[in-house]
């Protein structure tokens, strides 16, 4: 933050933590350890990116994404950190699932990985954002 760079802080659980019902606990710990207390929407972006979803073609359902986004917003408020910080979703985003993901509450955008290397598909996702 002191260098005037805006970090995207990626947080996410692995498959075992998710299966064991520890996803929320893991994400809270990651937030505690990685989000500076002076963070705000002008100097920080958060991205929920479940590790198990990256490159797998699988994503959590919208209910799970919403639960995580709401928990992150609550964590920001509880820690007296600007809760208008954008929260992105990343992890196997593609043109087939982007529209549904965009419908999530508290979503500030998408963190797009491999599909960003496919100009036509990436453009379609960008159009969906409008």
List the model feature ranges, each with a label:
Residues 1-130:
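Active-site loop-to-helix "anion-binding N-cap" substructures in soluble metabolic enzymes
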